[in-house]
Design a protein with these regions (language model features):
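Conserved G/P- and acidic residue-centered "switch" motifs that form tight phosphate/ATP-binding loops
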Residues: 92
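Conserved N-terminal entry element of GNAT/NAT acetyltransferase domains
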Residues: 1-12, 152-153
Length: 153
């Protein structure tokens, strides 16, 4: 597996991976209406590209195929997105991305808003639960969890 820096031409593929992953992997924890509100299929590619460029963004590739991505705001330590292709779950891709993204930080704490589905992954990586949250997307309420992890330097 190759971890590499994000390139603007990756954006459409990452948006598709995001949509496919949410609708397949997260379907065990969220209702169809929640999945549709979370991943509508109409991502603003310009806004996503700007966000990826403003953050440290890594792309995971396996045999030339994009199989995951993640991005983190290095100034605040906020892990914004971490997604692995629905067909490549459980292969250590999220762990590799998360570790590499955390390694780029000089702040003492990393934090994220984890889905119900991702919560066990983050607990296993040393994050602690701060609070359960209800967020609204397109008029639909979703549950997620603010989680944080101190970085030992």
């Amino acid at each position: 597996m190759l971890l590499r820096a994000y390139r603007p031409e990756d954006c459409p593929a990452l948006a598709q991976l995001f949509y496919d992953t949410v609708h397949a992997v997260n379907a065990r924890d969220y209702a169809p209406a929640q999945l549709d509100a979370w991943a509508t299929g109409t991502v603003d590619l310009c806004a996503w590209n700007a966000s990826f460029l403003a953050h440290r963004t890594l792309v995971a590739q396996l045999e030339g195929q994009i199989v995951g991505f993640g991005d983190i705001d290095v100034s605040s330590g906020y892990l914004d997105r971490l997604y692995v292709h629905k067909d490549f779950q459980g292969r250590g891709i999220a762990t590799a991305l998360e570790g590499a993204l955390e390694g780029a930080l000089s702040v003492p704490l990393v934090y994220t808003d984890a889905s119900i589905t991702a919560k066990p992954f983050f607990l296993g990586r040393g994050y602690r639960l701060v609070r359960e949250q209800r967020v609204e997307r397109h008029g639909v309420t979703l549950t997620n969890f603010r989680m944080e992890k101190p970085l030992l330097r």
